[in-house]
Amino acid sequence: MSFNNPDHQLDAIGLRCPEPVMMVRAAIRKMNDGETLLIIADDPSTTRDIPSFCTFMDHTLVAKDAEQAPYRYVVKKGL
């Protein structure tokens, strides 16, 4: 899976912790199992928070580009 053709997209540019993760959680609640969410963020804490959220909430971190901002993540709802 790459960053192309996600089912949903979330722009969290300019938001700071804890807002990005709260928005991810709200977006994923509305999704069906197996759908993907592309997250674009510039808060450095997301490099830690998004992977931790996936582990804790049993979602799959499909792709991650966190070398420099803007950071990009693709999360699949469910495992």
From Swiss-Prot:
Keywords of the record: Cytoplasm
Active site per database record: C17
Subcellular location: Cytoplasm
GO molecular function, one term: sulfur carrier activity
Origin: domain of life: Bacteria
Pfam families (alphabetical): TusA
Family annotation (InterPro entries): Sulphur_carrier_TusA, TusA-like, TusA-like_sf
An example Gene Ontology biological process: tRNA wobble position uridine thiolation
One GO cellular component term noted in the UniProt record for this chain: cytoplasm
Family statement: Belongs to the sulfur carrier protein TusA family.
Protein name listed in UniProt: Sulfur carrier protein TusA
Gene this protein is translated from: tusA
